[in-house]
């Protein structure tokens, strides 16, 4: 046993220090990034935000809606090949190039993903997702996927430390998904005691990944557009959002009614709700590591997308970044004990 003495930070522990700016308007900020990925060699341009691969967020409807903002969607792994075929046949290439095909690490997952990727060459992204990316089996699966799909851009995770970022990139991942326990409906940290404050994880993993020519996506922990800006400021190439995009018409959650008011269910993918829906229940050897919440219906996701992008543009103007690419170089974090004046939050 050992203790690391240095303090690790989450998004709530910092603010971004403002700096002189020559920008006259938020409209002067360019949020689109252009990437060429290390292993696949593929080039992509767009806004580097990703809707999370949860079945109450990462739906076909969400992908269609967010593609108009140049935002990616990691479509959840529980759609059938037949459902994928119908979606591909009814969608334009502009939509499909903003889609990630999500998969687990079983042999059945691999075969299913192979069939989905064969439906249309515009499906260029694969998101290999497990809760614990530290297992040897996971690393081997990433290598297997890279060998099978040499020209596909592979996103793999989740991990929170630099050495595993390096391991996954060397095994074939183009993008490493960073985050254990920060999600709004994730209870891993309280069920297991395992985790890592998200901002520190992003900073450390970005440093490791960029040294090898790889990239990272910050997955979890964002509750406001300001948190998204902090993730990019900390070095994230992409930011994945779950709770911020939940509860919308496109989110896919089941709608329930209480006292005449309608709510949408949103749950973690290791929750009892998710396991009952997809695998028949919680296995006797494990505990649920997610919770289920009821969210008031939030309408179309386009309004939320505009709010997030607007906040991100504003953050860039405060530090003089004319492009999102410049935000990391212009970010200085200050440690704080308060984020906002909360006097009217209960009203």
Curated annotation (Swiss-Prot):
One of its GO terms (molecular function) is metal ion binding. It holds the Pfam family IMPDH. K(+) binds at residues 181, 183. It comes from Escherichia fergusonii (strain ATCC 35469 / DSM 13698 / CCUG 18766 / IAM 14443 / JCM 21226 / LMG 7866 / NBRC 102419 / NCTC 12128 / CDC 0568-73). The active site is at residue 186. PROSITE patterns: IMP_DH_GMP_RED. Its EC number is 1.7.1.7. Catalyzes the irreversible NADPH-dependent deamination of GMP to IMP. It functions in the conversion of nucleobase, nucleoside and nucleotide derivatives of G to A nucleotides, and in maintaining the intracellular balance of A and G nucleotides. Belongs to the IMPDH/GMPR family. GuaC type 1 subfamily. InterPro entries: Aldolase_TIM (IPR013785), GMP_reductase (IPR050139), GMPR (IPR005993), IMP_DH/GMP_Rdtase_CS (IPR015875), IMP_DH_GMPRt (IPR001093). Homotetramer. It is an enzyme of class 1 (oxidoreductase). The keyword Protease does not apply. Keywords: Metal-binding, NADP, Oxidoreductase, Potassium. NADP(+) binds at residues 108-131, 216-239. One of its GO terms (biological process) is purine nucleotide metabolic process. The gene is guaC. It catalyses: IMP + NH4(+) + NADP(+) = GMP + NADPH + 2 H(+). This is GMP reductase. One of its GO terms (cellular component) is cytosol.
């Amino acid at each position: 046993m050992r203790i690391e003495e240095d303090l690790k930070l989450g998004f709530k522990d910092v603010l971004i220090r403002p700096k002189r700016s020559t920008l006259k308007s938020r409209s002067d900020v360019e949020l689109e990034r252009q990437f060429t990925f290390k292993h696949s060699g593929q080039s992509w341009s767009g806004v580097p935000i990703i809707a999370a691969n949860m079945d109450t967020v990462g739906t076909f409807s969400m992908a269609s809606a967010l593609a108009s903002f140049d935002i990616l969607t990691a479509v959840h792994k529980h759609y059938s090949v037949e459902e994928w075929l119908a979606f591909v046949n009814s969608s334009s290439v502009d939509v499909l190039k903003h889609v990630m095909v999500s998969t687990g690490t079983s042999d059945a997952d691999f075969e299913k993903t192979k069939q989905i990727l064969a439906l249309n060459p515009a499906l260029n992204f694969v998101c290999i997702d497990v809760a614990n990316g530290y297992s040897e089996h996971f690393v081997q699966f990433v290598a297997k996927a890279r060998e099978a799909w040499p020209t596909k851009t592979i996103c793999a995770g989740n991990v929170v430390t630099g050495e595993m970022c390096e391991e996954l990139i060397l095994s074939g991942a183009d993008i490493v998904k960073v985050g254990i326990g920060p999600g709004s409906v994730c209870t891993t940290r309280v069920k297991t005691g395992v985790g890592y404050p998200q901002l520190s994880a992003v900073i450390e993993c970005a440093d490791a990944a960029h040294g090898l020519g790889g990239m990272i996506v910050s997955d979890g922990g964002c509750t406001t557009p300001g948190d998204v800006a902090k993730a990019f400021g900390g070095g994230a190439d992409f930011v994945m959002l779950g709770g911020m995009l939940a509860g919308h018409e496109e989110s896919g959650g089941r709608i329930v009614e209480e006292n005449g008011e309608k709510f949408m269910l949103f749950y973690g993918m290791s929750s009892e709700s998710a396991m009952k829906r997809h695998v028949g229940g919680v296995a006797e050897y494990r505990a649920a590591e997610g919770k289920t919440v009821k969210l008031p219906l939030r309408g179309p996701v386009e309004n939320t997308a505009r709010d997030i992008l607007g906040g991100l543009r504003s953050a860039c103007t405060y530090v003089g970044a004319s492009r999102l690419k410049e935000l990391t170089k212009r970010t200085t974090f200050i440690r704080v004990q308060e984020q906002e004046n909360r006097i009217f939050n209960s009203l």
